[in-house]
Amino acid sequence: MKIMQNNLPVPTLGVSGVVFNNQKQILLIQRNQPPAMGLWSIPGGKLEPGESLVEACQREIKEETGLDTEVKNIVAVVERRVEGFHYVIIDFLALLVDKGNSQPIAQSDVSEARWVSLEQLNDYDLVEGLAEIILRTYNVYNGGHIAGLYDVDATGSDYILPSVNFA
C-alpha cells in the first residue's frame, strides 16, 4: 500500500469474481489477512503489472480457490476505504470452466473457500455491500441474462452497457 504525503492511502485497483455453480450457490472465501481479515467475500485481489482486468480476475480466483473460470461481464464497481486501505474494486461475473471439478480449495491469503446457498448468506459475516451485489447478479443471471457491462471487442479492455431500447 502506497501512502501519499498527507498520510492517506493511494487508491489501489482490484478485481473480484462473482461465481455461481450448478446448484445456484455462490463461491465465498474467508480472508486471513487485512483488510477484512476473518470476513467472507468473493475471490479477488489487486492487479499485477501488465495484467488486464480479466487476467487478474482469473488469476485471483485460481490462486484463492484452485478453480478455473471464464470471466464475463462487469457487475459492480465499488470503492472501499477500510483499515487504512483504499480500494476501487471491479466485480465480474465469472463462470466455471470445468463444472465437473468445482470443489474449491482454500489457497493463498484465504483460510476457507466454499459454496454457499443464497439462503445461507445471512449466516456469514460478509464484507460491506457484498450481499446486495451477489443477489442482484444472481437475479439477472438466473433470468437468462448476463448482467452488467459487456466486453465490446472480446479483448478484456473495453466494457460498455448493452444496447437498451429507450422507448
Named regions from a protein language model:
Residues 1-16:
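Acidic, metal-coordinating catalytic segment for phosphate/diphosphate chemistry
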Residues 4, 75-81:
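Short, solvent-exposed loop/turn elements at beta->coil junctions and helix N-caps
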Residues 25-26:
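Hydrophobic "anchor" residues
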